[in-house]
């Protein structure tokens, strides 16, 4: 089967749905967090291309602890994996973590075919402390 951008993106998203469904709740993985706030700002390497709008996600204890997020570009088959960033935040006991990730996916850029996505994610992850017992 030949994989085009739509096929590869659909296969990736289906795998992500299965992995998200199998993930433990946030309260089990990281009981020290009452919540996690993830702020995403995107930047394109080409200034002539408009970057996707920023995203804000708040995760509460019952939420599945899955930290892989699809690239917001509709023609891209890549994603951003923040699993290690969240784990490092939990280990550090700091209230926030931030960093940059580059999408490793492929996008259809023009009639010549696919090219690397190169979208950069600038993220901030802020933890809400667990309530006192």
Predicted regions mapped to residue ranges:
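Short linker/helix segments within small regulatory modules
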Residues: 61-65, 86-100
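Low-complexity, intrinsically disordered/propeptide-like segments
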Residues: 6, 14-15, 29, 36, ...
């Amino acid at each position: 089967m030949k994989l085009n951008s739509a096929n590869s993106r659909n296969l990736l998203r289906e795998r992500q749905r299965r992995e998200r469904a199998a993930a433990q709740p946030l309260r089990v993985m990281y009981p020290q967090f009452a919540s996690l706030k993830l702020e995403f700002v995107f930047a394109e390497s080409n200034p002539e291309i408009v970057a996707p709008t920023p995203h804000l996600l708040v995760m509460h204890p019952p939420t599945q602890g899955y930290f892989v997020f699809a690239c917001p570009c509709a023609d891209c088959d890549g994603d951003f994996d923040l699993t290690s960033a969240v784990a490092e935040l939990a280990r550090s006991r700091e209230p926030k973590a931030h960093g940059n990730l580059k999408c490793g996916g492929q996008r259809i850029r023009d009639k010549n075919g696919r090219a690397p996505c190169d979208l950069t994610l600038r993220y901030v992850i802020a933890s809400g402390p667990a309530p006192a017992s």
